[in-house]
Amino acid sequence: MEDAEVAVVALGSTAGTARAAVDNMRSAGIKAGSVKVRVYRPFPAKEVFATLGNGRVKAVAVLDRSDALNNHAGPLCMDVTTALYQAGAHVPPSIALPHILNYIYGLGGRDIKPADIEKVFEDLHQVVQGQAASQPPTPPGMPLYENPMYLGVRE
């Protein structure tokens, strides 16, 4: 994470898959990183902000394994967003908070593959380059799209 411009946040074994994707993206020239949340409660908000709210990380994808039906993002994304927003209220304006994208994966017990996470990194890289897709970006530190995007779901 030392020089990462784009990062993914994941729980459990998905973090190992993300690490493999990070290695592939770094060999392709993209400054990628990953954050593994080891303990969910109490949520490590200070550590998340110290890692992602440093001004170097420009875009973050939060990988949730469950959907939140009454929220605009998954539970992990909501906690990461809250950690960045609350701590970000106390930082100088010169430090920009990253854009946040939320991805839901693993519905129906489907596995996530390194290629899926590499696609997420490509999306993040496009956001950093200012080429975000279909929906307009929201302010930094808030989820980038109104609804989460889904990985590995059959249509």
PLM feature segments, named:
Residues 2-30, 43-50:
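Redox- and metal-dependent alpha/beta enzyme cores, enriched for Fe-S-associated oxidoreductases
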Residues 12-20, 43-47, 55, 71, ...:
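Conserved active-site and cofactor/substrate-binding residues in soluble primary-metabolism enzymes
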Residues 12-14, 38, 66:
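Residue-level signal for short, function-critical loop segments
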Residues 24-33, 55, 87-96:
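Secondary-structure transition/capping motifs at alpha-helix termini
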Residues 35-41, 102-107:
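Short beta->alpha junction loops
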Residues 48-70:
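A structural-propensity feature for long, helix-poor, extended segments
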Residues 64-155:
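Peripheral docking tails and interdomain loops at the edges
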